[in-house]
Amino acid sequence: MAYKPQFYPSATKVAENRRNHINPAFELEKLREIPDEDVVKIMGHRQPSEDYKTVHPPLEEMDLAEDYVRDLVGPINGAKEGHRIRYIQFADSMYFAPSQPYDRSRLYMSRFRGVDCGTLSGRQVVELRESNLEDISKNYLVDTELFDPATTGMRGATVHGHSLRLDENGVMFDALQRYEFDEATGHILYVKDQVGRPWDEPVDVGEPVPQEKLKEITTIYRKDGVAMRDDMEVVEVVKRIHRARTLGGYCPLNEIFDTYL
């Protein structure tokens, strides 16, 4: 019988959202359509019309030694072409942002190949071959329900703000002021790239997701939303993992489980 992964325990809405994010078969809701060149502009690694820089020749032109594993696992397109590794980094407000750092790393590694994730309390960076990174950034990380222009920020440096109160327009604080709320349209406009370099023309990433919808799609446990202490199945799983790690060093010995768990 084929193994069917559970992805995440519990039946609460937050747990369901986390489960959906990690499940590669689940189709994320598309909320906006940001042009490719605008996403490239925000990332700031190359000009929209510029060719991809490479760090090695295309694989088919290289004289590589025989490798059984390489024959089993085909390269992603960026690796085939020798494209360099680049990154995108997100900060997610603790005030009901759709995603958060651990959720991002789980879903990236579950849905995409060739990713390298860095997970901190208030930021999450993912590295990938540049062409593949642009593809997932546009089609998954910005256009879908994973992104809210007000509570999610593309920030390659100086990411502070995830734990601060939202401003009067519901927008997360950004020390580098990479984006601003346009009162005339109600949209969020990026005026700098992810590391804070300013532009002459802004990039419109659309209107903020309504608060009611954020509470429906968030993966963050909050006392004024779905409190984690009330989600007993998740609490028990987390306690079990923590005890196994602390007492057994992740070594699944029966005496550890029988005695302490």
From Swiss-Prot:
Subcellular location per the Swiss-Prot or TrEMBL entry: Cytoplasm
Residues the record lists as binding coenzyme M: R123
Task performed by this protein: Component of the methyl-coenzyme M reductase (MCR) I that catalyzes the reductive cleavage of methyl-coenzyme M (CoM-S-CH3 or 2-(methylthio)ethanesulfonate) using coenzyme B (CoB or 7-mercaptoheptanoylthreonine phosphate) as reductant which results in the production of methane and the mixed heterodisulfide of CoB and CoM (CoM-S-S-CoB). This is the final step in methanogenesis.
GO terms classed as biological process: methanogenesis
GO CC annotations on file: cytoplasm
Domain of life: Archaea
Reaction(s) catalysed by this chain's protein: coenzyme B + methyl-coenzyme M = methane + coenzyme M-coenzyme B heterodisulfide
Alphabetical UniProt keywords: Cytoplasm, Methanogenesis, Transferase
Similarity annotation: Belongs to the methyl-coenzyme M reductase gamma subunit family.
Annotated protein name in UniProt: Methyl-coenzyme M reductase subunit gamma
Pfam family name, one: MCR_gamma
Enzyme Commission number(s): 2.8.4.1
Free-text cofactor note: Binds 2 coenzyme F430 non-covalently per MCR complex. Coenzyme F430 is a yellow nickel porphinoid. Methyl-coenzyme-M reductase is activated when the enzyme-bound coenzyme F430 is reduced to the Ni(I) oxidation state.
InterPro entries reported for this sequence: Me_CoM_Rdtase_Fd-like_fold (IPR009024), Me_CoM_Rdtase_gsu (IPR003178), Me_CoM_Rdtase_gsu_sf (IPR036994)
Co-factor requirement: coenzyme F430
